[in-house]
Amino acid sequence: MAERGNDIRPGQVLDHNGALYLVVKTMHTQPGKGGAYIQAELKNLKTGAKYQERFRADGYVNRAIIEEVSFQYIFGDSSSLTLMNTENYEQISIPVELLGDKSVYLQENMILTLLFHKGQVISAKVPDYVVLEVVEAESVIKGQTASSSYKSAVLENGRRVSVPPFIKVGEKIVIYTPDDTYYERAKD
């Protein structure tokens, strides 16, 4: 589906130069001389390689037709995951590499979003927010205001994140998975 270059947005998938690319970020530029263009950071969905591309604002790009389907995580091993479609209960197996480094967030019965292009799975995403328990946290010295207001903590999945000083071992916190950061203390 052809779309104007000016309408490119992060999160879209483009069919560009014979490959599928995820638009990571965009910036509209209007130079003093010449036509406006969109500077886009693209990620190749097959290889994972990122690169910069310029699109004319008044030109056209091919947007890939993508279908998003929700699947429930059932079980997995080091190389593949078995998932169940939440609508028709069909089970499929996908390589764990489709999740990349976000596979550490997998939890039993978690709902994943799979992206399909022409019947093939091209990408998988964990939810944006995941609740995890803090298993290790640095101690904070009272009145310590000269240094950063965050401390390092280790989560139950082994991931290390920065958390506010009031977070203690055993507490559950919400992690924003796209950038692996603390979001808030989990509500009971």
Swiss-Prot record:
PROSITE patterns: EFP (PS01275). It is found in: Cytoplasm. One of its GO terms (biological process) is peptide biosynthetic process. It comes from the Bacteria. SMART domains: EFP, Elong-fact-P_C. Disulfide bonds: none annotated. Pfam families: EFP (PF01132), EFP_N (PF08207), Elong-fact-P_C (PF09285). GO terms for molecular function: translation elongation factor activity. Keywords: Cytoplasm, Elongation factor, Protein biosynthesis. SUPFAM superfamilies: Nucleic acid-binding proteins (SSF50249), Translation proteins SH3-like domain (SSF50104). Pathway: Protein biosynthesis; polypeptide chain elongation. The keyword Ribonucleoprotein does not apply. GO terms for cellular component: cytoplasm. InterPro entries: Elong-fact-P_C, NA-bd_OB-fold, Rib_uL2_dom2, Transl_elong_fac_P/YeiP, Transl_elong_KOW-like, Transl_elong_P/YeiP_cen, Transl_elong_P/YeiP_CS, Transl_elongation_fac_P. Belongs to the elongation factor P family. Involved in peptide bond synthesis. Stimulates efficient translation and peptide-bond synthesis on native or reconstituted 70S ribosomes in vitro. Probably functions indirectly by altering the affinity of the ribosome for aminoacyl-tRNA, thus increasing their reactivity as acceptors for peptidyl transferase. This is Elongation factor P.
